[in-house]
Every structure is written in structure tokens, then in C-alpha cells.
Amino acid sequence: TGAINFVAGMILDYRAFDTFGESNVLFMAVIAVLMLLQRDKKNIDAAEDQEMQEDEMLDAEDSKLILKKGAKCLAPVVILYGIYVVLNGHLSPGGGFSGGSIIGAGLILYSVAFGHKKMQTFFTIKTLTLTTAACLLTYCGCKSYSFFTGANHVGWEVPKGTPGAILSSGFILPLNICVGLVVACTMYGFYALFTKGEV
């Protein structure tokens, strides 16, 4: 496989379609939860409207000053560490699932500290669905080449690069990135839907 991390080679090369299926399950789960829990903005009663306004006022107040200061320092570090874990998944322990979980936790931390409205300025339902769908299509395209080469990888081999380099191990790095983004979007999507009823 060209990957120094044997587990990444196993999961994203030999068992790539199994991992693709797991990523699709995550996507379908977040879409199902979205359909079931998304708040209907046209059909809100007075009590629910008042509750939403109170939540917005609490988010706007400086009652979470310590949390905001801590998250302002910590959230970028957490997200950056998650990106590092995703990008080095073929070289060391980690990869798309663990790095995506770390990135998702960073997004949740930011949302808890600064409020759902501020998070919606750059992460909306459109962002969630487009990112997840694009990652799944990219994953499918990267691994479908074997079907076009006789389903045995004999006709055309993906260049593996130099073992130990960041751009090595063929398609394992892009697949790790795709899986990481799907997991991060799913984690944040579940959090937002269960707490606010919208992404």
C-alpha cells in the first residue's frame, strides 16, 4: 500500500469499500436525524419562539466569559491537531476517523462557547450536506479506478511515492481527508440538531 501505518493501509486500501460503506452510514444517519429533528421555522408556537430568543440572549451575554476566552485559545489548537492527525494518518497512528472526531469536538467547543448563530456564519446545513456529499463522491471516485482497470489493480497502479513522505501511499491520504471531513461534519451535525434543532 505504501503506507507506513499498517492499519491505514488495511482500512483504506484492502478494506476500502467497507470503510466507504461506514462513511455512507454516517451520512445517512445525519440526514435521517436532520429530517426527524430539524426545527420547522414556519411552524413555531409562542413558547418555542420565546425559548429560542432566550437562548440567543444567553449566547449574546458575557456570562460565558471564561468559556469564551478558553475556547478562543483552545478551539483552533484542537482543530489544528485534528487536521494533523488526519494528514498523518498514513504515517503514524490516527487517520480520518480519529482526526475527524477531534475536528468535530473543536467545532462543538466553538459552538458551545460562542453560540449557534455565530457558528452558522460559516457552518450551515448547506455546508454540511455539500461537504459530506463531495467527500463521499471523491472517496467513491478514488476507489472506483480498480473497476476500470479490470477490478484487479493490474492494469494501472497508483504511484505510491516515497514511504514516510506526506505525499505517499497513493490514495490513502485523500481518503483519510474525506473520511475525516465526513466524521467531523457528522459529529457537529448531530450536536447541533440535538441541542438547537438546526445546523
What residues fall within each predicted segment?
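Juxtamembrane interface elements at the cytosolic ends of transmembrane helices
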Residues: 7, 20, 30-58, 190-199
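Hydrophobic cores of alpha-helical transmembrane segments in multi-pass inner/ER membrane proteins
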Residues: 26-34, 105-111, 175-189
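Membrane-water interface at loop-to-transmembrane-helix junctions
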Residues: 53-74
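Hydrophobic alpha-helical membrane-insertion segments
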Residues: 128-145
